[in-house]
């Protein structure tokens, strides 16, 4: 009911109760009751991601979104329980989710690990979070924050939380290149971006932030190039285009231009 209410407020006029890889196939190819669409967006499990990969080309897709990820940069001035909760906020999504702490203080790292162990039994999805943390959770202690910049850009996390002082957070923000969404400061937990901050939280995973961005209105837009030459314009550009076409061995390309340069059109002249 909550999703239906939100859809009504947003002006959605068509809803299908379905999910999984079979829903992706139905949307891509159409059925007796579903008209095939042009583009499919949104995350899902491994089966949905695989299905989107298969139908790409028949329809457009936004991205191949995998299990959730978070990388937290935190110094010793943070509350270890807060940082532990940040890590577990992604671990509870999926047993394949990955939560990474990067800090410059070993004692603080141990405190966060202890806080994670304390919080895990209290979670509604504790079994999932425990499996995720045991398999893919990581704590990395760096000598300095310069090392952290390189790590972040190599990992290219879906979510990057920078829990440093204001000056260092801003400095880190200026240097980091690869992250799906960035959360600045100790009072900006990742879930605030999931639910209410504003930016879309459908984000690139599996290092996809190296070359792509989160879902936005731009994913629902496309562009067409519009080109018009008058006779003087073609006279200016045409000779160089002919040279390029001939260099490629595409004589029909060259002729389409040169005929217009060298012959008049009796129907318009």
Regions found by a protein language model. Give the residues of each.
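Structural motif
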Residues: 13-16, 37-41, 45-47, 62, ...
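Glycine-rich, charged/polar anion/phosphate-binding loops
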Residues: 55-59, 83-88, 145-147, 167-170, ...
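A conserved active-site cap/scaffold subdomain adjacent to cofactor or substrate pockets
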Residues: 63-135, 139
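C-terminal core of ALDH-fold dehydrogenases
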Residues: 145, 154-269
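Conserved NAD(P)+-binding/catalytic subdomain of aldehyde/semialdehyde dehydrogenases
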Residues: 9-98
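Glycine-rich, Lys/Arg-enriched anion-binding loops that position phosphate/diphosphate groups
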Residues: 120-155, 159-161, 165
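Short, ordered loop/turn segments at secondary-structure junctions
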Residues: 20, 45, 76-78, 104-106, ...
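Active-site-proximal loop->helix
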Residues: 1-10
């Amino acid at each position: 009911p909550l999703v239906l209410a939100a859809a009504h407020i947003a002006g959605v006029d068509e809803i299908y109760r379905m999910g999984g890889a079979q829903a992706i196939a139905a949307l891509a190819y159409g059925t007796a009751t579903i008209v095939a669409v042009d583009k499919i967006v949104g995350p899902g499990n491994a089966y949905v991601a695989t299905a989107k990969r298969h139908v790409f080309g028949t329809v457009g897709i936004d991205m191949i979104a995998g299990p959730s990820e978070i990388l937290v940069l935190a110094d010793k001035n943070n509350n270890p329980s807060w940082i532990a909760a940040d890590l577990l906020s992604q671990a509870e999504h999926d047993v394949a989710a990955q939560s990474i702490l990067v800090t410059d203080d070993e004692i603080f790292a141990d405190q966060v690990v202890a806080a994670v162990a304390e919080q895990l039994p209290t979670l509604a999805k504790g079994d999932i979070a425990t499996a995720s943390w045991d398999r893919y959770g990581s704590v990395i202690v760096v000598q300095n924050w310069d090392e952290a910049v390189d790590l972040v850009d190599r990992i290219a996390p879906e979510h990057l939380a920078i829990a440093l002082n204001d000056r260092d957070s801003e400095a880190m923000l200026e240097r980091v290149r690869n992250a799906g969404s960035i959360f600045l400061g100790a009072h900006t937990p990742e879930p605030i971006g999931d639910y209410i901050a504003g930016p879309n939280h459908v984000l690139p995973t599996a290092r996809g932030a190296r070359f792509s961005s989160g879902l936005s209105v731009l994913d629902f837009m496309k562009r067409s190039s519009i080109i018009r030459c008058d006779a003087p314009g073609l006279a200016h550009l045409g000779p160089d285009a002919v040279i390029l076409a001939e260099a490629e061995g595409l004589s029909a390309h060259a002729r389409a231009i040169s005929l217009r340069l060298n012959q008049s059109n009796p129907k318009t002249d």
